[in-house]
From Swiss-Prot:
<dbReference type="GO" id="GO:0032259">
    <property type="term" value="P:methylation"/>
</dbReference>
<dbReference type="GO" id="GO:0008757">
    <property type="term" value="F:S-adenosylmethionine-dependent methyltransferase activity"/>
</dbReference>
<keyword id="KW-0489">Methyltransferase</keyword>
<comment type="subunit">
    <text>Monomer.</text>
</comment>
<feature type="binding site">
    <location>
        <position position="188"/>
    </location>
    <ligand>
        <name>S-adenosyl-L-methionine</name>
    </ligand>
</feature>
<dbReference type="GO" id="GO:0005737">
    <property type="term" value="C:cytoplasm"/>
</dbReference>
<keyword id="KW-0808">Transferase</keyword>
<keyword id="KW-0949">S-adenosyl-L-methionine</keyword>
<keyword id="KW-0963">Cytoplasm</keyword>
<feature type="binding site">
    <location>
        <position position="260"/>
    </location>
    <ligand>
        <name>S-adenosyl-L-methionine</name>
    </ligand>
</feature>
<dbReference type="GO" id="GO:0006364">
    <property type="term" value="P:rRNA processing"/>
</dbReference>
<feature type="active site" description="Proton acceptor">
    <location>
        <position position="306"/>
    </location>
</feature>
<dbReference type="InterPro" id="IPR048646">
    <property type="entry name" value="RlmM_THUMP-like"/>
</dbReference>
<dbReference type="InterPro" id="IPR002877">
    <property type="entry name" value="RNA_MeTrfase_FtsJ_dom"/>
</dbReference>
<dbReference type="Pfam" id="PF18125">
    <property type="entry name" value="RlmM_FDX"/>
</dbReference>
<dbReference type="InterPro" id="IPR029063">
    <property type="entry name" value="SAM-dependent_MTases_sf"/>
</dbReference>
<feature type="binding site">
    <location>
        <position position="240"/>
    </location>
    <ligand>
        <name>S-adenosyl-L-methionine</name>
    </ligand>
</feature>
Length: 366
């Protein structure tokens, strides 16, 4: 198996391909990306047969911006016989995976694939039974063993392969299933909720998204992102010239500051979170975020960078590099992650966590 398949947002295949080619080369792995426009997936074919597995093990999935999922795959299985589609799939996986922990029969995230999804649901049950009989799947689901992927690109055509649970997306098709809260002021609230799921390990939520923390939301109107912070019982300063939803103001946890998010300067010194979803040039937003981090005005931040029409991967990489350069210049150790989330559109969500403060005499929690 010499291919790595990556799922992405429809229309962002070129960015995903540019990124995997770049990141693979940094790992000493060379190959070429096959891109079909608006297919919502990319195939990276490695020149060396073992290199696909090397990428699946050693290229941190968390370092990829445009990929929703990454798994190793073999050749395309075509023209599966309608009377027995199971046997060829089992045959392809024989000797490749042993006692996998989970089976995911998936499709690309496109409108055209919705009909295929119905078939995948029906196909999963008999396939799971056959894979367990062949010892390709364990008799019970476990997160400690590889995930078996069967990826249908058309009726009767699929790729088969595997991913490692310590280096993949835990979500089916790489998409967290979130429900829009009826009392949220806008659908943008799902972006921040998804960001929490993607960037913060579940066992750290109680510590890092804790009751009573102080947070700032820049460009908050009408309050979609503020809603997520209020829901976690934080005190929020919502900065925007536009009005906030009355339902949020009624909680007593929100202070509305009628100011420009770019000009606002915090007076508190104990702000844990700053979040920002402003429609502005990405370089300008990145510069503002760097200023907050360098000055120690917050410990963690999640913000969106709106993407240009062209050279989107290059633009995002440049923005993140400029933040990293300013942090390095001031001796600040930080973790930076970025991802184009399912609920993002022409944008990328970035998370930065400062490990220690830039302000003298002040310590972070770690």
């Amino acid at each position: 198996m010499n291919k790595v398949i990556l799922y992405c947002r429809q229309g962002f295949e070129k960015e995903c391909a540019a990124e995997i080619t770049d990141k693979a080369a940094q790992q000493g792995v060379f190959g070429f990306a096959r891109v079909k426009e608006n297919s919502a997936y990319v195939i990276f074919e490695c020149y060396q047969p073992d290199d696909a597995d090397k990428l699946a093990r050693e290229l941190p999935f968390s370092s990829l911006i445009f990929a929703r999922q990454m798994f190793v795959a073999g050749e395309l299985l075509q023209d599966l016989p309608p009377e027995d589609r199971v046997t060829p799939v089992v045959g392809m996986l024989q000797g490749v995976v042993e006692k996998g922990g989970e089976l995911r029969v998936e499709v690309a995230d496109t409108n055209e694939s919705k009909e295929l999804m119905k078939f995948c649901r029906k196909f999963t049950v008999p396939l799971r039974t056959a894979l367990r009989d062949a010892k390709i799947l364990a008799n019970f689901e476990t997160p400690k063993r590889p995930v078996v992927h069967v990826f249908f690109i058309a009726p009767g055509c699929c790729y088969t392969g595997y991913s490692y649970t310590n280096n993949n997306s835990p979500f089916y098709m790489g998409i967290p299933r979130l429900k829009f809260p009826a009392d949220a002021p806008s659908r943008s609230t799902l972006k921040l909720e998804e960001a929490f799921h993607v960037f913060i390990p579940a066992d750290e939520w109680d510590e890092r998204l804790a009751n009573g923390m102080y947070a700032v939301d820049l460009g908050a109107c009408p309050g979609g992102w503020t809603y997520q912070l209020v829901k976690r019982n934080m005190w929020v300063a919502s900065v925007d010239n536009g009005p906030m939803a009355q339902s949020l103001m009624d909680t007593g946890q929100v202070t509305w500051l009628r100011e420009d998010g770019f000009k606002y300067r915090p007076t508190r010194t104990n702000i844990t979170w700053m979040v920002c979803d402003m429609v502005e040039k990405p370089a300008k937003v990145a510069a503002l975020m760097a200023q907050w981090l360098v000055n120690g005005w917050c410990r963690e931040t999640i913000f969106n960078l709106k993407l240009p029409m062209k050279k989107r991967y290059e633009e995002v990489s440049q923005n993140i590099a400029s933040i990293q350069a300013q942090l390095d210049e001031h001796g600040i150790n930080a973790q930076i992650q970025a991802r184009q989330l399912y609920h993002d559109r022409e944008e990328v969500t970035v998370h930065v966590r400062r490990w220690w403060a830039a302000v003298g005499g002040r310590r972070d929690e770690r």
